[in-house]
Amino acid sequence: MATSAAFLKGDFKRTGKMELSDEQKSQMWINSVNSENKEALLAWVKETGIELVQINGQRKYGGPPPGWIGNAPVSGSEVFIGKIPQDIYEDKLIPLFQSVGKLYEFRLMMTFSGLNRGFAYARYISRRQAISAIMSLNGFEITKGCCIVVCRSTEKSELALDGLPGNFDENMLKNVLDEVTSGVSSISLHPSPTKESQVLAVVKYDSHRAAAMAKKTLCEGSPILPGLPLTVNWLKTDMRQKLRSTDKLQQTKDLSPLPLLYTDRPDLPKETLLSAVGCLNMLCQEMKLGRPVFLIKLFSVTSFGWIRFWYQVVIPTYPTPFCGYAWMIGENLELNEKYEHARQVVAMKILSALGYIPDFSLGDVTARNAL
């Protein structure tokens, strides 16, 4: 051992005590916490040959277990175990939960000191065995006076991505996510409840593991759009309910008649109808606001082909200018086409802010500009 070697070499301070690094002191303290049960765990691991792997604050058995052939068990086969005494380890827990069914995976959440965090997850090979574990072990007295809680695991698989640009659609986001994550099964977009003119995406993955890996990737170094303050969290029940309420309110607004739709006006040229800038110019002319003046500053292209840009639009007799940041796809456009497409994106945002929504999509504008 390093400590013994240092002692034999006479590595002392003048006080006669051996000099230990902060890391060695920390390790000695960790080893001293619950040492008796830790030694029992080590003996059990050696005796059974079971393999436990420490990964990101949890210690895991299986997933899959030795000899497993085939796909992982279906959703609903995992149980949550709560109110575990913090000094109890897998040598007590795994045999207990194996007594009611075959375990595919067992995960015990751990603290830095080596104590458990009071909860774990056990995944069985079938839903029936998970139900059996709940019926048999919920309320089980694992130590004197300590009864554990066993219930169905929610197996979270949905992420909330808040702060996306307002011109994102599901296909754009899926293409980006497929580059950095795997297992996306569905995407829905909603107005952000916290960030004006931006979008919150609910992304459902095909498993909890895929969602957890995606969350880790998106939070730790693979941002969807560099420079964009994107927030990534598990989708919570209160947020789901809030989004549903917002969507219902938006549907009601969508049914209300709009004050003006330029596509209903046969006297306007088709080119004007398909141009957000043209529609904005016509609106400002009819309202006697003056012709809008656009100022656009382009930034670098991201690895996904997105361009971030700053804009300011001054409408002569409108009280305040419109300004901010926006995103667009334009990697393969010429410089003048990039500026024109940025103008179209901004014009759409301003028309929406003024309450006038032309009956065309930016997809039409993109296609026309790309020709």
Curated annotation (Swiss-Prot):
Pfam families: DND1_DSRM, RRM_1. One of its GO terms (molecular function) is mRNA binding. CDD domains: DSRM_DND1 (cd20313), RRM1_DND1 (cd12487), RRM2_DND1 (cd12493). GO terms for biological process: germ cell development; mRNA stabilization; negative regulation of miRNA-mediated gene silencing. It comes from the Eukaryota. It is found in: Nucleus; Cytoplasm. GO terms for cellular component: cytoplasm; nucleus. PROSITE patterns: RRM. Residues 85-163, 165-245 form the RRM domain. Keywords: Cytoplasm, Developmental protein, Nucleus, Repeat, RNA-binding. RNA-binding factor that positively regulates gene expression by prohibiting miRNA-mediated gene suppression. Relieves miRNA repression in germline cells. Prohibits the function of several miRNAs by blocking the accessibility of target mRNAs. Sequence-specific RNA-binding factor that binds to U-rich regions (URRs) in the 3'untranslated region (3'-UTR) of several mRNAs. Does not bind to miRNAs. May play a role during early embryonic survival. This is Dead end protein homolog 1. It comes from Xenopus laevis (African clawed frog).
